[in-house]
A protein has these predicted regions:
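N-terminal binding-site loop/beta-alpha segment at the start of enzyme catalytic domains
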Residues: 1-83
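A short acidic, helix-capping loop that chelates divalent metal ions and anchors anionic groups
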Residues: 17-20, 92-97
Length: 119
């Protein structure tokens, strides 16, 4: 069984959507907030983290495309040994538009759990 030795994990909230906790920190991401560029930046960070033995990755649907970015990175690996944590109960609504009025919606109902976890 794979053992998680490193106590440090990597959360992808700031890399999975163009406007989140990364607003005002564009110097580390750059001005290009397109999905392709953000995916590329996310993959660069994941490459670095994996080389440093980070094996826990935190994603969520409310983190925009973080789940897709991580899964596309995992598919590129020859071998992946790690853990992925995700969450339910929040829905990302901004559709990659930083100017959107409402970016997320919280719904902790049983029907929403079924929708997100067991479609």
């Amino acid at each position: 069984m794979f053992k998680l030795d490193n106590k440090l994990g990597l959360g992808l909230a700031a890399l999975g959507r163009p406007g989140y906790i990364n607003l005002g920190h564009h110097q580390s991401i750059g001005d290009d907030k397109s999905k392709d560029n953000m995916r590329s930046k996310c993959h660069e960070v994941l490459d670095f983290a994996y080389k440093k033995d980070i094996r826990y990755f935190d994603v969520a649907r409310v983190y925009g495309e973080s789940e897709e970015f991580l899964s596309s990175w995992i598919r590129k690996q020859n071998q992946f040994a790690g853990f992925v944590g995700s969450k339910w109960g929040y829905e990302y609504l901004a559709e990659w538009n930083v100017e959107t009025e409402q970016h997320e919606r919280k719904d902790h109902s049983h029907p929403f759990l079924k929708k997100q976890c067991c479609p």
